[in-house]
């Protein structure tokens, strides 16, 4: 069981990447117990993904944070914890990294405040983009109040929304 904890999925590999080159790139983060590049059974050609297993789970986490999105053999790779598959990836990991955490926090109040008071009401495109823009569940958590407010105000007049917007923008 312990060996599975330090196991990383590495996707987006070049077909030229082999176990040796993958180990070389990841070995600077710690002791590696196993490297596998998954190959097609018939052609023996790389299928573009593999696994790197570290002896130590902390080394694996360091490698995952450092190498995700980096270029190996000319291809940008995706590194994730193996076995936690898409469920974990879409919620926590991609949600946190897609928008960049710093931009996320700093930009939320000011950026959303201005767009709420400005063109956001004029055309609904922004609202939908922000919901499906790869920011994960946390964005919905913050904007759920304004989301439902936005939809109900459209049909019932915007008095609450207008006062809220002017408060939000003047408050900065």
Swiss-Prot record:
Chief site of localization: nucleus
Extent of Gly residues compositional bias: 93-106, 114-125
Modified residues (Phosphoserine): 130, 138, 146, 156, 159, 163
Tissue specificity of this protein: Ubiquitous.
Entry's Gene Ontology BP terms: mRNA stabilization; positive regulation of mRNA splicing, via spliceosome; positive regulation of translation; response to cold; response to UV; stress granule assembly
Induction text: By cold stress in response to DNA damage induced by UV irradiation or UV mimetic agents. Up-regulated by hypoxia.
Composition-biased stretches (Low complexity): 138-172
Keywords: Activator, Cytoplasm, Nucleus, Phosphoprotein, Repressor, RNA-binding, Stress response
Subcellular compartments: Nucleus, Nucleoplasm; Cytoplasm
Post-translational modification: Methylated on arginine residues. Methylation of the RGG motifs is a prerequisite for recruitment into SGs. Phosphorylated by CK2, GSK3A and GSK3B. Phosphorylation by GSK3B increases RNA-binding activity to the TXN 3'-UTR transcript upon exposure to UV radiation.
GO molecular function: mRNA 3'-UTR binding; RNA binding; small ribosomal subunit rRNA binding; translation repressor activity
Gene3D superfamilies according to UniProt: 3.30.70.330
Domain of life: Eukaryota
Gene Ontology cellular-component terms listed: cytoplasm; cytoplasmic stress granule; nucleoplasm; nucleus; spliceosomal complex
Domain RRM, residue spans: 6-84
Chain positions covered by the region annotation Disordered: 69-172
Function text: Cold-inducible mRNA binding protein that plays a protective role in the genotoxic stress response by stabilizing transcripts of genes involved in cell survival. Acts as a translational activator. Seems to play an essential role in cold-induced suppression of cell proliferation. Binds specifically to the 3'-untranslated regions (3'-UTRs) of stress-responsive transcripts RPA2 and TXN. Acts as a translational repressor. Promotes assembly of stress granules (SGs), when overexpressed.
Notes concerning its domains: Both the RRM domain and the arginine, glycine (RGG) rich domain are necessary for binding to the TXN 3'-untranslated region. Both the RRM domain and the arginine, glycine (RGG) rich domain (RGG repeats) are necessary for optimal recruitment into SGs upon cellular stress. The C-terminal domain containing RGG repeats is necessary for translational repression.
Entries under PANTHER family matching the protein: TRANSFORMER-2 SEX-DETERMINING PROTEIN-RELATED
Subunit structure: Interacts with EIF4G1. Associates with ribosomes.
Protein name: Cold-inducible RNA-binding protein
Taxonomic source organism: Homo sapiens
Highest classification ranks of the organism: Eukaryota, Metazoa, Chordata, Craniata, Vertebrata
UniProt gene name: CIRBP
């Amino acid at each position: 069981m312990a060996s599975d904890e330090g196991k990383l999925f590495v996707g987006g590999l070049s077909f030229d990447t082999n176990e040796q080159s993958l180990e070389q790139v990841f070995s600077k983060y710690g002791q590696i117990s196993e490297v596998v590049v998954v190959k097609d059974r018939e052609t023996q050609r790389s299928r573009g993904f593999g696994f790197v297993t570290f002896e130590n789970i902390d080394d694996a986490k360091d490698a995952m944070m450092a190498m995700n999105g980096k270029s190996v053999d000319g291809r940008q790779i995706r590194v994730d914890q193996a076995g936690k598959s898409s469920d974990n990836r879409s919620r926590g990991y991609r949600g946190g990294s897609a928008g960049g955490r710093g931009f996320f926090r700093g930009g939320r109040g000011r950026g959303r405040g201005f767009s709420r008071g400005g063109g956001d009401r004029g055309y609904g495109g922004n609202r939908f983009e922000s919901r499906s823009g790869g920011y994960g569940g946390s964005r919905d958590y913050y904007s759920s109040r304004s989301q439902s407010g936005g939809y109900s105000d459209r049909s019932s007049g915007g008095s609450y929304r207008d006062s809220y917007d002017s408060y939000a923008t003047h408050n900065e």
